[in-house]
C-alpha cells in the first residue's frame, strides 16, 4: 500500500459537480492523502498505514516551554481528506505506458481502502473521502509545500 501525503491549508473533492469531501481553510490545515492498494495488501496492511498516517509528525507545534517541535495529525486534531488512487501502483520501468498489474482489483481494493479510513476514524480523526472508483476533481492549497511518500509493503512485497 502506498500513500502520497500532502500537508494542506485546504482541500476539496468534487464528484459529479458536488463537493463530497473537504478540509476547510484553517491555521492547522490538514492532510490530503492519496492511497493506492496493491495486490497482496490486507486489512493488516491498512491498519499499519492508518497508524503511520495518524502518527506521522509533519505539523509544526511547540513544547510547553515554547521550543519548536513536530507533531502529528492526532496531536493537533488535523482533518484528513483520503482519496483512493490506483495509479500510485503504476509501474513505469518498461516502455512508455504504465502497467497497473501491481494494483489490486477494485473488488479487492475497496474493502482494504475502507478499513484504512475506518481505522483513522477510530483513532478520533475527522476523515472525508472521495467516491471509490469515480472520476474526481481534487483541489488543494499546499502548505509548505510538504509532501511525503509512505510505503507499507504487503507480505507479498516485503
Predicted regions and their residues:
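N-terminal, polar/charged subdomain of small-to-medium soluble alpha/beta proteins
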Residues: 1-95, 111-158
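A charged helix-plus-loop insertion that forms the helical arch/lid used to bind
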Residues: 94-105
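Conserved acidic
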Residues: 108
